[in-house]
């Protein structure tokens, strides 16, 4: 079986889809399943609303191949209701896809509620991070004077949690905490140090020097930034929204209000709650994709 990924992968700081597909490409290559020539492909994997003209062309040229659609969203929930990309995804899934991969059950259910016509063949495969880059320290971090907090977001959309980060910037006790942010922010922080967009290698290093990762993104289907932080061994605290509860299975680390977050932070600081991370590795996720593709081909 040969797999062709319909996506232009970039080696620079960019969104989670690009990062995950780069990792998946390496996994397919390691398993000798990857092809760079569409003429050799048994399976075409395409992503969300990206490169649909290419997908349409390949579908016409290679009608015997199977086309698998990896879906996130709904984008109308984490962007705004005028976002037309969901309709492009739904059209592509109905027109081109022989099967669908959802990134979380939350994403699957919300897309179906908002108009996606279900594909008869589908599965849910959660994302993972590249463990060559995102891995924990061998020795636990020694105690420092301040607890190091970290957040990241490639997108600067307000629903990525910036109102909440702004609240923390103004209200946290920065005698106890230091706080770093990586990515693009619409907020000019006073106390939080904005590192800007970082390459994966540098981001992973920054994560490993931190203690607690915080995400307040709303309606995020399967947050790659959260998975990267967990993979680096951080204790992670997340807004109870989107696919976060499927990634952080211990609800002691999920919050809905500012006061709940502060309570969780205090419990972590006092060692009253301890998080045990259960993140899958790229080999497992790659094998899940390959097994699903093999089922489609039989």
Which residues does each PLM region occupy?
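A short, active-site helix/loop in glycosyltransferases that binds the activated sugar's phosphate group
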Residues: 95-120, 129
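Aromatic "clamp/platform" in nucleotide-sugar-dependent glycosyltransferases that forms part
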Residues: 218
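Acidic anion/phosphate-binding donor-loop and adjacent secondary structure
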Residues: 79-80, 112, 127-145
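Short hydrophobic beta-strand element within catalytic cores of glycosyltransferases
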Residues: 235-238
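A charged, aromatic-enriched C-terminal amphipathic alpha-helix characteristic of glycosyltransferases
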Residues: 270-298
